[in-house]
């Protein structure tokens, strides 16, 4: 087989591929074996008609078309490898020469990864986030723990304070008329949560249990119900119940109740240790992200829209998988959030473009620095996957090979190695807590 590649536009390559006659003949024979099982040729049992009779029955062009479908996918993949072409989309195939007894010649026009012009990527200054954990950090985390384990007490009397959980009846009016969806009874509202129209919850502060209150608000201009957007409204609200969090005292008894520790000091030490672990991971990530961002900022690349669209679909797929773990699908999510698939695609595009550019720059650096995944690293990654899915590593490897995913795994490993390379070659500046 012969293959040539010519860049005809900035991100478009034209492959010309010639497949030798012998291989075409082999494919024709394969096509015959496939077709003969599918047709009933008069005078012959199904699957037993000779090739010439099958050709007469279905037509030489039909049989040759089947042969072409057998040849092209493999020949195209071989041509990509031979010419080191990296496609980002499906090719447009044009047959130049296609008839029995001759070599098959076809052209494949394909959009490819753009060329990256790297800037300086060594010795760039990167700020490392502070990994300091202060006494104030520990106290804040302790307060959150205290809040999570608070008891809810129903008040017999009193007035609403911030963070109280209330049960309210309300009816909303616009232009003096009650509107659809503006009425509820015994609605649970945490005052100060910001879940209601701006200004609604603030006007409930100080209202006593059992009282009725008239609340005046204006619907936001971007409110989802167009008939209410931007309009002033009045809500008649009755306070049926007030519940308030009762915080436990921060002492040894509290530590025993909420943890495996016997004393408050031991609990604080454990909180500090865990906060430090998080801070150190955050600091490490800040250096890695900073090193990549600095290298990407110095590079120049024009990203094809097809690559951004593909990345958006990957992100949507990941989102769908995460939602499925919570028991809902994308359609339900869009219904709950009053959005659509197109809205989500548009919102995802900026992040998708950033991710694609990062990957392209990392791949370009890997090529220049000859950074690749070793066989040992690939085996380790496959072993991790095997342990996660609880299957034999060799079965996982074969599955990945069949799905064409092994290359992606090696690419991910190489990218991680490039990130470490950038970190090792960066000028790391220690940040402060204020940063």
Swiss-Prot record:
Involved in protein export. Acts as a chaperone by maintaining the newly synthesized protein in an open conformation. Functions as a peptidyl-prolyl cis-trans isomerase. This is Trigger factor. NCBIfam families: tig. GO terms for cellular component: cytoplasm. GO terms for molecular function: peptidyl-prolyl cis-trans isomerase activity; protein folding chaperone; ribosome binding. HAMAP family: Trigger_factor_Tig. Pfam families: FKBP_C (PF00254), Trigger_C (PF05698), Trigger_N (PF05697). It is an enzyme of class 5 (isomerase). The keyword Kinase does not apply. Keywords: Cell cycle, Cell division, Chaperone, Cytoplasm, Isomerase, Rotamase. Its main location: cytoplasm. GO terms for biological process: 'de novo' cotranslational protein folding; cell division; chaperone-mediated protein folding; protein transport; protein unfolding. Consists of 3 domains; the N-terminus binds the ribosome, the middle domain has PPIase activity, while the C-terminus has intrinsic chaperone activity on its own. Belongs to the FKBP-type PPIase family. Tig subfamily. It comes from the Bacteria. It catalyses: [protein]-peptidylproline (omega=180) = [protein]-peptidylproline (omega=0). It comes from Desulforamulus reducens (strain ATCC BAA-1160 / DSM 100696 / MI-1) (Desulfotomaculum reducens).
